[in-house]
Curated annotation (Swiss-Prot):
Highest taxon above the source species: Viruses
A Pfam family reported for this protein in Swiss-Prot or TrEMBL: Pox_F15
Family: Belongs to the orthopoxvirus OPG058 family.
Keyword line: Early protein
Protein name in UniProt: Protein OPG060
InterPro entries with a match to the protein in the record: Poxvirus_F15
Induction: Expressed in the early phase of the viral replicative cycle.
Amino acid sequence: MRSIAGLDKLKMEIFNVEELINMKPFKNMNKITINQKDNCILANRCFVKIDTPRYIPSTSISSSNIIRIRNHDFTLSELLYSPFHFQQPQFQYLLPGFVLTCIDKVSKQQKECKYCISNRGDDDSLSINIFIPTINKSIYIIIGLRMKNFWKPKFEIE
């Protein structure tokens, strides 16, 4: 796995949005919106935030487990890389390597990352929430990823 800037010696000692920014979670860090009040970085249909989660849904599973969606099994890695495989146009995107490196760092500390699919009422979209614990037991890196038209088949006929 490719090394992500700022993550080489990381022990998940993250406490504020500046530290998240230094981890460079997005492809183009010049096209982000920073919400200092909520310790959140916003980008194209996704966010990365440092916070205490209100709750982690009971439907959340370990990041190492597969999830079944519409009678298909997916790993978290497959879901993170799927916009690239399907060439969905995006001006800004979350780097899958950032998420997977964070998960790897946390798993080496015997902590568990979780993720879940949330139903937003749009049958063609996919919403993923990822919860990555930090060194502080109550603080997590929370990642929200929204993929429009995930299930919609698109064909070009020439």
